Amino acid sequence: MSIEKAHRMRAIKCPTDELSLTNKAIVNVSDFTEEVKYVDISPGPGLHYIFALEKISGPELPLGHVGFSLVQRKWATLSINQEIDVRPYRFDASADIITLVSFETDFLQKKTTTQEPYDSDEMAKEFLMQFAGMPLTVGQTLVFQFKDKKFLGLAVKTLEAVDPRTVGDSLPKTRNVRFGRILGNTVVQFEKAENSVLNLQGRSKGKIVRQSIINPDWDFGKMGIGGLDKEFNAIFRRAFASRVFPPELVEQLGIKHVKGILLYGPPGTGKTLMARQIGTMLNAREPKIVNGPQILDKYVGESEANIRRLFAEAEEEEKRLGPNSGLHIIIFDEIDAICKARGSVAGNSGVHDTVVNQLLAKIDGVEQLNNILVIGMTNRRDMIDEALLRPGRLEVQMEISLPNEQGRVQILNIHTKRMRDFNKIASDVDNNEIAAKTKNFSGAELEGLVRAAQSTAMNRLIKADSKVHVDPEAMEKLRVTRADFLHALDNDIKPAFGAAQEMLENLLARGIINWGPPVTELLEDGMLSVQQAKATESSGLVSVLIEGAPNSGKSALAANLAQLSDFPFVKVCSPEDMVGFTESAKCLHIRKIFDDAYRSTLSCIVVDNVERLLDYGPIGPRYSNLTLQALLVLLKKQPPKGRKLLILCTSSRRDVLEEMEMLSAFTSVLHVSNLSTPENVLAVLDDSDLFSPEELQSIARKMAGKRLCIGIKKLLALIDMIRQSEPHQRVIKFLSKMEEEGGLEMDRVQGH
């Protein structure tokens, strides 16, 4: 909009050829204040032309005069010494942002032409470097010098713009406008003028379809990303929304652009894929993608120099153009390789520390850059130096977690799209059903599942005898069916954050035998704890201690509760996996299991045989205090918001845990009883199918009135041993073994 009243001035020739290449109106520095950067030139009623100003001092441009080049005078229909009205002009916050400008391009002087190729991509970069912030009007002609080649004449053909007030809308649309201002990220296209001999090359030549810089309505299906809609939109809001506004408005608001994003989460969830799409979404310069370990070098100082080289181009452009500089994106994959916490890496070279220091200085140092965006990716956020994570550095930290069911459907749709397009997938395959069965699968594991199903389908059409033969009608016959997916799910692909089915099945090798009311009550109480852990109103953490005498079946009951919970993530923390571990290694192993559990929405951890985990020995007594303190902390630590964790611990020494003040860490304690009545034992014997009804009656008569106490595990082992003896000796053998094992007292209890 025009501001202040008009100055009556006189149009003259541009003082020098160099100034004419700026395509600006040249005025004396005393004619306008420093704040005035644009002017509205009016040579007559109803005629208005917007120019950028270049202020110079010296006698070559007298006060009250405006210098125009020949090209500018032709466009604005100005004659030398013509009086014109000149008003200061300011672009306000609602001014259109030019997202695309198309030029009709030809040699400025038709007599001096060349067949030398002009790289349109390099021309677009150079144009933005020279003219970012320049107002353009449809029909305006500019003089453009590209490197040391012939001068070009650029006539503005079309301008596409978006209103910055609509950026937050779900569908901001671009529209053609008459004039506006270009920014450092405007897409520049060059179209060869009719009958021109100009040799244009590159992607910025002619009309090409390219994404606008502002595109919040990102189509994840086409880009090959599924299940990350919320994360992608959050990143756009935090990191990119401020970059679509004019530099002057950003300066007035005092905004500092976000310079860094950290994407972290389990392996295979799409962090690298997402970073790649962020680069293409912005339509900025081609992002620089660097693997963390590539930065490290064997020569002293080279690692730091590699960091400096990544930022060199952005530094040069920042010095030349200041706030009008375009955006430079640098993507670090596996950033934990170079940004470990300082002082944590052994050795006296300190290479890792100096690399972190160099990166900190470049992102947010004394001479800070405002035209960069650093995207780091890692699955070990805990290893990264905390100074790198504060605001001003990698301040937007987005967890790319395991996809939910809706996200898994999107991912499966992406990976089965081509099969559906070419009718290579059977009609019985339902992605919604597969998504429901693949709890806690990452995106990479779902892709692996599709590949495994395809290989199963292809294998049906291969006949392998002495030679390998492929069915000649394979092209027509090949269909991937639901059975192929289920086979891959059962046999080929297991999620890294899924249930530890094999370990649970080992603990439940004999199943659960309901030998009496104590078992029923314990399972009911255990299921109440499971429901408590699942409940939305619960605190998110439920820990249960299942204690009882040795061989009473505690581990099997804990495994059974873990299976009945139907939690997608179930892990067993067993002393068997930590034989020979040092105390610190044991603590790290336990902590990793808990850290993995926090990544799943519903998790269950079975901590088997707690006293063995603590290295408890009764002679001494001796135990590992380091492991004890680690367990106490983890048993009480609340999982992240929105996550639920059920911890099932087993122990044969309640008295020891009480002395260690560990019982208070549990939400509830369940006691597992031994078998204590003849009816209990007979229920187990009946379930074993070892004795005939008559033999069971004989055993019942012999045990009547006797004192009993035996663990279910020991009783089952005894039954397995008796099974190997002669049938006619089994009853006598069983009773004698029961007495030997101390489970049965043969002295009759005298009644009172």
UniProtKB/Swiss-Prot annotation:
Keyword Iron on entry: no
Cofactor: Mg(2+)
CC terms in the record's Gene Ontology section: cytoplasm; Golgi stack; presynapse
Keywords: ATP-binding, Cytoplasm, ER-Golgi transport, Hydrolase, Magnesium, Metal-binding, Nucleotide-binding, Protein transport, Repeat, Transport
GO molecular function list: ATP binding; ATP hydrolysis activity; metal ion binding
Residues where ATP binds: 510-515, 550-557
An annotated GO BP: open tracheal system development
Main location as per UniProt: cytoplasm
Catalytic activity: ATP + H2O = ADP + phosphate + H(+)
Gene3D superfamilies cross-referenced by the UniProt entry: 1.10.8.60, 2.40.40.20, 3.10.330.10, P-loop containing nucleotide triphosphate hydrolases
Keyword Transmembrane helix: no
Family: Belongs to the AAA ATPase family.
Function of the molecule: Required for vesicle-mediated transport. Catalyzes the fusion of transport vesicles within the Golgi cisternae. Is also required for transport from the endoplasmic reticulum to the Golgi stack. Seems to function as a fusion protein required for the delivery of cargo proteins to all compartments of the Golgi stack independent of vesicle origin.
Subunit and partners: Homohexamer.
PANTHER family with a match to the protein in the record: VESICLE-FUSING ATPASE, VESICULAR-FUSION PROTEIN NSF
Protein name per the record: Vesicle-fusing ATPase 2
Organism: Drosophila melanogaster (Fruit fly)
Lineage: Eukaryota, Metazoa, Ecdysozoa, Arthropoda, Hexapoda
Gene this chain is encoded by: Nsf2
